[in-house]
């Protein structure tokens, strides 16, 4: 039977108290972030009537906004917490790509490692909302694997950056950036250079794509689906999350699995044991981008000197910040410290 521990009580309080002084150690930590990127666009307005043309609401637009999305949000989370993010991704030759570059620069993330593919548009996700209610989402994207020539450029770009990096994050949104061959080549070369690889997996990607990575961070539903186990038959079992995690660890051939569990917190499954951590979310307005924040903060902390359980708690606190906000937003260093102080005062 797997040994289980919990980070709680006085041990948790002491760990949280240590975070402010340890944040400085992350300021020079460099992470390569690889993944599909795009713009999250919002059209906000009021609904007062139904269209006479069709039974749909008419949105009277009040404001519009664009934010960094997908792996670009991971990169800006790394930067906003004080690290350095080298973002490797593919964009189209269009105005959305130019907007992305501007927003990356303003978020202290260099756009210099983006690769242009004229055959595909830059991904955009347009959300039309009235108050907190989503009316519709419109996706502008092309889901297909890269050409051999563009994929080769992506791999070469990562290879060139590895010498100066401390670790690698692969953010998989299953839009075709990384084939199995490319992902495996990146993982193996990263290990050959002594760099840890952190993966946020996608439920539709075969588990073998991630073989050999050091840490994978699925949410509970993704973990169950990727494990191949039947959640309906297991949900009444108190140890089901351990069975899912261990099955996933073996199936993916990875060292460590971190399963984010919403209000139930987070569980780390290693070859030796399992560690449970509580949630730090006090109010949940929007979980969009929470997984991006978790892997960014966790990877930054771990390669910056935190043990893996400590890094998980660090990531959990950062996620508690962003779920209390609306939309895809990063956790800044100031936000983190303010939220941490409020947690300690309430403890």
What are these regions (language model features)?
Residues 3-48:
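Positively charged, low-complexity intrinsically disordered leader regions
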Residues 7-23, 52, 56-124, 339-344:
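Substrate-binding N-lobe of the ribokinase-like
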Residues 26, 162-163, 210-211:
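A short, aliphatic-rich alpha-helical micro-motif
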Residues 32-34, 137, 166-169, 198, ...:
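Structural motif
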Residues 114-120, 127-162:
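Conserved phosphate-binding/catalytic loop of the ribokinase/pfkB sugar-kinase fold
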Residues 164-177:
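Short acidic, glycine-rich surface-loop motifs adjacent to enzyme active sites
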Residues 176-274:
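Conserved phosphate/ATP/ADP-binding segment of small-molecule kinases
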Residues 255-256, 280-343:
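Conserved post-catalytic alpha-helical subdomain immediately downstream of the catalytic base
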